[in-house]
From Swiss-Prot:
This is Large ribosomal subunit protein uL5. The keyword Nucleotide-binding does not apply. PROSITE patterns: RIBOSOMAL_L5 (PS00358). InterPro entries: Ribosomal_uL5 (IPR002132), Ribosomal_uL5_bac-type (IPR020930), Ribosomal_uL5_C (IPR031309), Ribosomal_uL5_CS (IPR020929), Ribosomal_uL5_dom_sf (IPR022803), Ribosomal_uL5_N (IPR031310). Part of the 50S ribosomal subunit; part of the 5S rRNA/L5/L18/L25 subcomplex. Contacts the 5S rRNA and the P site tRNA. Forms a bridge to the 30S subunit in the 70S ribosome. It comes from Streptococcus pyogenes serotype M49 (strain NZ131).
Length: 180
């Protein structure tokens, strides 16, 4: 069964963007390439259990096993040594990516307290969008009772768009609730 958001992209978004930006080929229309979820766990330096919990939560949210990230260099101020595990990340592509984006837009973001839309200034100039989530509780897979500590995560949506405007239109057409 094809994903609801992927069908919407094929049937509605491609024709709309082709008309707006006058693309000559269907392949020129921007699409979502991948979504990267990153959870930096700074307190994992002193307590490795925190990193395990964070990785387990990230696995629940994304549906795949996270990659443990390690410190690239030592920083004495943070009591950090090179090679120490300090975070977890997941790269979603294909079906899982569309499922996650659909869930993020329709279920998770509306659960954020005092939500007025995601900021429009978080584009990087190359058509990629970054979103910070302050608490992992907005995702339906995370049970309130199982959470030992509120952790945030970064969500990076990488698109094939060349400009921020094209990327914004793509995400808006896919249902991303941008702030007015």
């Amino acid at each position: 069964m094809a994903n609801r958001l992927k069908e919407k992209y094929t049937n509605e978004v491609i024709p709309a963007l082709t008309e707006k930006f006058n693309y000559t080929s269907v392949m020129a229309v921007p699409k979502v390439e991948k979504i990267v979820l990153n959870m930096g766990v700074g307190d994992a330096v002193s307590n490795a259990k925190n990193l395990e919990k964070a990785a387990a939560e990230l696995a629940l949210i994304s549906g795949q096993k996270p990659l443990i990230t390690k410190a690239k260099k030592s920083i004495a101020g943070f009591r950090l040594r090179e090679g120490v595990a300090i975070g977890a990340k997941v790269t979603l592509r294909g079906e899982r990516m569309y499922e996650f984006l659909d869930k993020l837009v329709s279920v998770s973001l509306p659960r954020v307290r005092d939500f007025h839309g995601v900021p429009t200034k978080s584009f990087d100039g190359r058509g990629n969008y970054t979103l910070g989530v302050k608490e992992q509780l907005i995702f339906p897979e995370i049970s309130f009772d199982d959470v030992d500590k509120v952790r945030g995560l970064d969500i990076v949506i990488v698109t094939t768009a060349n400009t921020d405007e094209e990327s914004r239109e793509l995400l808006k057409a896919l249902g991303m609730p941008f702030a007015k």
